[in-house]
């Protein structure tokens, strides 16, 4: 017998993933995962790079003033235009981002990047988040655990931040602050 509610568990997983993705997007694009991949290795690198949370690997094949061409795992060439990237923020440090200006400052031929497709198959730049999160939802009447999420993606990090992590000093009073 468990107090876990499967609907709440699914919602908690989705909430952690969307929250981490939104946070990571607000803090800016950090750049390519890998650089200077030789052209004759592109197909092999793409085949050996896992898709993570719908974030597909792609390799920059050409750079122009107004667009870049990327090669996807399926072997197709896609176009990312300057207009597609106009809202992209660039990571500077933990508290600073800068506005994206030129494609040549951000991408080089042979860069391994990530893309994500929306419902209309339009692509945009993505990245695997650099942060993790955890969530525990409890019933306040009897303390039963309703949902438990130990991280962003178990395949990338099997460390369960709910059951294995230690609380930070000073965190004991936060529930009382949030309850008021």
PLM features: residue spans?
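Extended, non-catalytic substrate-recognition/exosite surfaces adjacent to catalytic cores, especially
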Residues: 1-180
């Amino acid at each position: 017998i468990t107090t876990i509610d499967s609907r709440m568990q699914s919602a908690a997983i989705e909430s952690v993933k969307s929250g981490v993705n939104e946070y990571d997007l607000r803090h800016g694009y950090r750049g390519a995962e890998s650089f200077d991949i030789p052209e004759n290795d592109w197909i092999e690198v793409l085949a050996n790079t896992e898709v993570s949370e719908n974030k597909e690997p792609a390799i920059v094949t050409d750079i122009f003033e107004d667009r870049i061409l990327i090669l996807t795992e399926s072997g197709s060439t896609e176009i990312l235009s300057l207009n597609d990237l106009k809202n992209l923020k660039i990571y500077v440090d933990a508290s600073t981002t800068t506005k994206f200006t030129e494609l040549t400052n951000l991408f080089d031929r042979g860069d391994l990047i990530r893309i994500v497709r929306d419902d209309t198959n339009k692509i945009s730049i993505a990245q695997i988040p650099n942060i993790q999160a955890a969530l525990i939802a409890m019933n306040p009447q009897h303390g039963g655990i309703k949902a438990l999420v130990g991280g962003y993606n178990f395949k990338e990090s099997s460390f369960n931040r709910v059951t294995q992590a230690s609380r930070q000093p000073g965190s004991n009073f936060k529930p009382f602050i949030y309850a008021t």
